Amino acid sequence: MKKILIADDEHKIVMTLEYAFKKAGYEVFIARDGSEVLEILKEQIPNLILLDIMMPNVDGYTTLSEIKKNEKFQDIKVIFLSAKAGENDIQKGLELGADAYVTKPYSIKKLLEKVEELI
């Protein structure tokens, strides 16, 4: 079973994504901020992380930078999910090593397709 880690501090978004990905056959892990992502990665290696940028404590950019520093995590695909839709935001996310950048609001169907494409 493929594993996906959803990192977002907005409860409704997390619940919607969790439902959709479980229904699609994924094992789902949840983090509310970047520090929780890094804690989960000590125990689980997901195939992909859906990573919000604007989260409390440790933001998505910092989280991705920390992930990319660790060779153990190099094969994990990362999709940024963010309301930050500016060209500079998208460019920064991709330069940090994200495999894709999806702006909110988004279609769950298209997001599932993007995840399938990457993993």
Regions found by a protein language model. Name each.
Residues 15-23:
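Charged docking surfaces used in two-component/phosphorelay signaling
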Residues 106-115:
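C-terminal output helix
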